[in-house]
Structure formats: C-alpha cells, structure tokens
C-alpha cells in the first residue's frame, strides 16, 4: 500500500484526549489495511506497562499497540519518566531504568543530544517497518520555554516529517484561546506542519458550535477536521493522576460496597482498580480527606512512586488512615510495598503483603 506520512496527535494541553484519539486512529488504519504502529518519544507516567520481554513503556502506548494489532515494544515509547517527587523522576530509557534525575538537570541542554538520538533511532526503526507511525505528543505543544530541549512535540514532528493534528479540549473551556495560542506560538516552519485541528469532548447541540468552527479556522488558518463528542464509555487506562481529583468527587457507581482508594500525591499503578470501578456491586472513589475515608467499607492504600524513606506512613496519616476505626478492612496494594504497622507509627521494617 501507499506509504503514508507519519501523523502526530499533539495537544493544547494535558488530558485533552491525545492518547484515545491516537489509539482510535491506530485501529482505523489497521481496519483500512495498513500496518500502523504507535510512537511517543517521551512519556511521563506513574502507570507503566511491562512488555513481553519484561521492559517498561507507558500504558497508553500498550493500548495503542493493541489497537494496531501489535505486541508492545520499547521502540513505541523509548523514554519514560516516572515522577518520584515534584522535582525528581526516574528515567527509563528503552525500557530500563538508568537513574534518577532532577528536573533542572534533565532539561539541561548538555547531554540532551544523547537522549534525542535514542528517541530518533527508535522512531526510525518503527518507520522502516510500519505504515504509518501514529505519533502522540506530550502535554501542550506551546511550552516555548522548553523548546530547545523538547524531544516529543514539534521538534519530533519536524524530524519525522509528520503531519500534525492539534487536539483541543472544549469541555474544560477556553478552546478558542488554547487552539489559537498553540498554533501561533509555533515557529513558521513548525506551524506549516499543523494540518488540522480536532475539537474533542464536545457536549450539547453541535449546531450551536458551527459558527465556532469557522471562527477557529479563520483565526488559526488551519481547518477544523472534526468535532468529537464527550465519551464516557471509552476505557483507555490513564497514565497519570490528572483525572483522579474528579474521581474523588464522583464515585464510580451505586454498589452496596463502598471502597475508598487513598489519593496519595504520587500514586502509581492505580489502573489496578479499573475493574473495581466497573463492578456494579462496588462504589469506588478516590478519597483525599479523612471524612471521605471514614465513609468507606474498605480502604485501599495504593503504592506510590517515591524515594525510599517514610513517605507512606506520613502521607496516610495525613489522609486519616493511620487510626481510622470506622472501616472494616484496609488493604495495601503495590508490588513490594512497605505495609503500615497497625498503629500507624513509623516502622522501618519492610513488611510484604
């Protein structure tokens, strides 16, 4: 079949729907007879996926690989950052941890070419085998203060010769400003690569937005290629905890058993709880206060990606789980997680669940 240009779904911000849209297009290309493969040069995620050979990539690329009919591979996400604190993260390169870095040193131009060469090489390998490569950007494409060290958005699109589709979230408000700003803050040569704008998460009567479509096209000089409705039944696993604050306010169902997952700051692998969310017998929610926790029949203390030390006891005491007496059961959940002693006091002895 005809060799297609790589296509990148970039975003006006985080959580605008890039991962879902990219997964959808992986399946569409597959159904149309092509052999697509997903690619995200750099991912920041607390939830990772283990490939068949035991290496780590972002979960979104694993879902996209499934949509494309492929087995997940580290070339699909060669650089994975796993936050440990607000300023440090574990760097996973080609599926293997290579150490911890603070934000300032990670974005320092010195040594940046090494990482850039690695992600470019991973793309080249995919591009030589698959058609097309369905690329995903990260966060917003208009973080111009990081332009010179950017590995994943427009510089990656320029390297790949990709056609860029800008995904804008209308549900959060400000779609005109975010779309216009994202386009106009690009360099002229980068702006030329943006071939279309996709409005995502629309609610209501589309006829009311038809004038808005024309306004965006006139302002940005880029066609709006579609408007996607707000879907509630697409279960693509989240990579970070941006949606968990909303889940803290809205329970998953009306089941008889109330399950509270403590909303820790650096919670990881919370996708383990997805099946509970979909169980009609369970009312699962993420709790960030002692009052919310006290309403649960079962408390789950999740794992969190953080430096070794004493983060879990202090964090859980702050949330009110250390001495909670109104709950029937408490369950620690994470591979090799240190379990809290029953009285909630610090205890350096590791206890496996």
Report residues per predicted region.
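Catalytic nucleophile serine of serine hydrolases
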Residues: 337
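Extended Lys/Arg-rich polyanion-binding regions
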Residues: 340
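Flexible phosphate-sensing "switch/lid" loops adjacent to ATP/NTP-binding sites
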Residues: 1-325, 349
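Ser/Thr/Gly-rich flexible loops in soluble cytosolic domains mediating phosphotransfer, phosphorylation
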Residues: 327-331
């Amino acid at each position: 079949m005809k060799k297609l240009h790589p296509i990148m779904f970039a975003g006006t911000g985080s959580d605008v729907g890039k991962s879902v849209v990219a997964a959808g297009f992986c399946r569409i290309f597959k159904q149309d007879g092509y052999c697509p493969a997903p690619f995200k040069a750099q991912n920041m995620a607390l939830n990772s996926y283990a490939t068949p050979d035991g290496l780590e990539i972002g979960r979104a690329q694993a879902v996209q690989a499934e949509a494309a009919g492929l087995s997940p591979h580290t070339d699909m996400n060669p650089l994975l950052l796993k936050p440990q604190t607000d300023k440090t993260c574990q760097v996973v390169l080609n599926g293997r941890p290579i150490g911890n870095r603070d934000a300032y040193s990670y974005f320092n131009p010195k040594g940046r070419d090494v990482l850039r060469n690695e992600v470019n090489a991973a793309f080249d390998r995919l591009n030589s085998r698959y058609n097309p490569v369905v690329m995903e950007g990260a966060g917003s494409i208009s973080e111009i203060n990081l332009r010179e060290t950017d590995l994943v958005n427009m510089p990656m699109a320029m390297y790949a010769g990709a056609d860029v589709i800008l995904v804008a979230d209308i549900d959060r408000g400000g779609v005109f400003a975010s779309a216009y700003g994202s386009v106009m803050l690009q360099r002229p040569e980068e702006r030329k690569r943006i071939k279309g704008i996709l409005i995502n998460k629309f609610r209501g009567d589309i006829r009311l937005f038809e004038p808005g479509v024309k306004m965006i096209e006139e302002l940005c000089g880029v066609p709006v290629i579609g408007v996607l409705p707000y879907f509630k039944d697409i279960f693509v696993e989240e990579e970070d905890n941006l949606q968990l604050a909303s889940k803290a306010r809205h329970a998953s169902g009306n089941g008889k058993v109330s399950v509270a997952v403590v909303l820790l700051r650096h919670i990881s692998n919370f996708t383990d709880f997805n099946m509970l969310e979909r169980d009609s017998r369970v009312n699962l929610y993420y709790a960030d206060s002692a009052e919310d926790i006290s309403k649960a029949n079962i408390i789950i203390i999740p794992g969190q990606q953080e430096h070794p030390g004493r983060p879990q006891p202090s964090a859980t005491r702050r949330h009110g789980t250390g001495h909670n007496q109104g709950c029937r059961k408490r369950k620690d959940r994470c591979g090799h997680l240190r379990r809290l002693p029953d009285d909630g006091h610090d205890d350096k002895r590791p206890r496996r669940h």
